[in-house]
Amino acid sequence: MVKIKRKQGEGFRAIFGELEISHLEGTIISAFFPEAEEMTIKEIQERVDYSYERVNSALKSLTEKKIVIEKQKGKTLIYSIDLEVPYSYSLGFNRYMLQREVEFIKKHKTIYKAIQEVENNPLSWNVILFGSYSKGTETQQSDVDLIVTCLPNKEKEVENFVKSLKHKYGINFSPVVFPIHEFPTIKKDNPELWNDLKMYGIVFKGDDSFYSWVYKDDK
């Protein structure tokens, strides 16, 4: 998994409806991603870089707020995030993905400018970076791998647009373009790619549908 810095400045609190979420609680919610699987307190603590006591207290609070689910396996407490509650998306996945995007942009400003053009194309619905650039293992010879979903019968038009950006930016894109309704079929047709998208993909456009496909529909 790509390592990201999850700890940010102190003093942040947000109010969502009737719930008040502290900075630490928000950081813990995002720490469940990208796997969104069960974790121990120690595993969560390693990701958020706070003391055991503070993490434990925040987890108890999140459990009371019904955002996190606590259960016991043997002598160990295990925690998981409830993917159906809106905070899992807004404070969890969104926050995690924003951090991924920011770290990518810092390293690859020119590539990001080109990706923005794909985002702004009215025919594109999802724009997802995958492959070596999303994993941080790219070389000078690496193409930029993008999945772009679009309206049916617009695949060739979108593919040609993405490839045309090479002339403007000097970047070799390797786009995979298909209609938006075909995205969920990746899970069955190419489970290795599906897992790579979940673990390493950077979603620049369409993160709400990506979250639904990968996390809610994948349960």
Where are these regions (language model features)?
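Short helix-loop-helix/strand-helix junction enriched in hydrophobic and basic residues
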Residues: 125-133
